[in-house]
Amino acid sequence: MFSNYCFLPFILLQESDDSMESPLPANTNRDIIKQNDKPMSTSILKTASKINPHGLGIVYLDNYQMIKLKSSEYKTLKTKRPFIAHFRYKTKGVVSKANTHPFVCGSNTDELLMHNGTISGYGSDKMTDSEQLAIELGSMPRQAWKNKLSKYDSRFVAINTHKKSFEYLGMSIFSKNFTNFNPLLKK
């Protein structure tokens, strides 16, 4: 599907090498989508953990199992299993596993949402902006999500654990500015 890509704020990886320098500029990457069976670079994972220290949410793409950990437990991602991972940097809500992505979308427990950015007008000290938006999306048909999320200057990954599928919604995940930082991108 993808080959040799890294993008901001999502990193799409097909190949990895532990000797490679981390392509992560400070305060940027939070989500990693790994769709192959090669373990990721420890330096990439460590850097993501350091700059986004407030939680780690993972959905494994082989069985769509979700787990939530501390960012410091990044070595869990040293696996051959494909996954989508979100390293949290707190902007709204408290630091807790409950406030770590992905979020269940309302009462539809098959639908999950990961998000990068801040949604104006959403969130509080008790609930993150992403969690509030996920709850709202849960009351809408999935087909309406694209229109709703395109209104925000943000990027989203919507995951359906029953259908074992995911898609990108909202702003384009591809950042042309990132190629300067990306040793994995082959021209």
Where do the PLM segments sit?
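Conserved beta-strand-loop-short alpha-helix elements that form
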Residues: 110-123
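Acidic loop->beta-strand submotif enriched in PP2C/PPM serine/threonine phosphatases
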Residues: 92-112, 147
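Short coil/turn connectors at secondary-structure junctions
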Residues: 79-81, 108-110, 153
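Catalytic core of PPM/PP2C metal-dependent serine/threonine phosphatase domains
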Residues: 16, 24-27, 48-54, 98, ...
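Regulatory input/activation interfaces that engage signals or partners
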Residues: 86, 91
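Short histidine
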Residues: 120-175
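A generic structural motif
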Residues: 59-61, 104-106, 159-161
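Extreme N-terminus nucleophile/cap motif
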Residues: 1-74, 83, 172-187
